[in-house]
Amino acid sequence: MSDIISIKDIDLAKKKIFIRCDFNVPQDDFLNITDDRRIRSAIPTIRYCLDNGCSVILASHLGRPKEISSKYSLEPVSKRLARLLDKEIIMAKDIIGEDAKTKAMNLKAGEILLLENLRFEKGETKNDENLAKELASMVQVYINDAFGVCHRAHSSVEAITKFFDEKHKGAGFLLQKEIDFASNLIKHPARPFVAVVGGSKVSGKLQALTNLLPKVDKLIIGGGMAFTFLKALGYDIGNSLLEEELLEEANKILTKGKNLGVKIYLPVDVVAAPACSQDAPMKFVPVQEIPNGWMGLDIGPASVRLFKEVISDAQTIWWNGPMGVFEIDKFSKGSIKMSHYISEGHATSVVGGGDTADVVARAGDADEMTFISTGGGASLELIEGKELPGVKALRSKENE
């Protein structure tokens, strides 16, 4: 993937730099940041620019605001970043308004300006070129370090790159690391290569499953999506999550796996309950015996032992999607145990963003994993073999 223009290929000295970051961090009801991994991941690129005598303008989105509201302000991000960098962060009140433009114009070498939430501008998600042009006009160099949004053709990710030539745009360190990791994983995995796929829906992972099959040695399917596969095999799954319209696709994946010699593992028992709540009664049952009206909400202890055995000889593990409804304590055990087993082994372990990263953080295993992707959707699309708009825009034309 070395045909992507890197920040290291660009002469940054004393220039004004725009860095598109991904500061889309989780917050509690009081807007306190509960996990600042994404902010910390951006620091190497920011420091590199400062070390080159640059002035730096940072931009990100946060959540999906319908209108401008303090709930989605990047103010808490600027405070956390200031603490992590031990440096003042100048906060703009807007994005391309008078406040941002004046502060951008007066920005001196070594100073950092953070623009307000990009999605307060309606044009951002529409890939609006006028917004992109306004943003581009503030700086001399554009750096994308926001892997988590590279699968979206948005104004600050794709349209903006049209206003910079190859000597003035490139990928930051985090973005490069993410892309290199994903492409090596797909092209040269150490074997046995095991994919552990979970989460609630088959529909979201269908393309990734299809693309992974020819590349993996074993495939573990857990989480809510496992029930569509179990149903396809003729099991009675009670009230468990089912995507009826995908039964045929599930069957195709199982057949394709068989033909390719891939060993596919599904849960053999589940934690069943009549309702998805902390107070509901629960019991462990084999998948053949899910009671009528009950639903499977986590993998059971026998499945945990089986999956542990399956990954015991793995050299590479790619994990995307929890094994159950991990947000509810009593249905989180399967996911937490999987996290422990994956992190304890000697395999190269790659965790695909989003919910899975939250599970790993909750299990206290983050430091033991080889690599935790900062982008759920983007990491899935790379595994699906798709070209991400934000990455394509940074390719060197000579190599096309």
Curated annotation (Swiss-Prot):
Substrate binds at D22, F23, N24, R38, H61, L62, G63, R64, R119, R152. It comes from the Bacteria. Pathway: Carbohydrate degradation; glycolysis; pyruvate from D-glyceraldehyde 3-phosphate: step 2/5. InterPro entries: Phosphoglycerate_kinase (IPR001576), Phosphoglycerate_kinase_N (IPR015824), Phosphoglycerate_kinase_sf (IPR036043). Keywords: ATP-binding, Cytoplasm, Glycolysis, Kinase, Nucleotide-binding, Transferase. The keyword Kinase applies. ATP binds at K205, G296, E327, G353, G354, D355, T356. It catalyses: (2R)-3-phosphoglycerate + ATP = (2R)-3-phospho-glyceroyl phosphate + ADP. It is found in: Cytoplasm. Its EC number is 2.7.2.3. One of its GO terms (biological process) is gluconeogenesis. HAMAP family: Phosphoglyc_kinase. Belongs to the phosphoglycerate kinase family. This is Phosphoglycerate kinase. The lineage of its organism: Bacteria, Pseudomonadati, Campylobacterota, Epsilonproteobacteria, Campylobacterales. The gene is pgk.
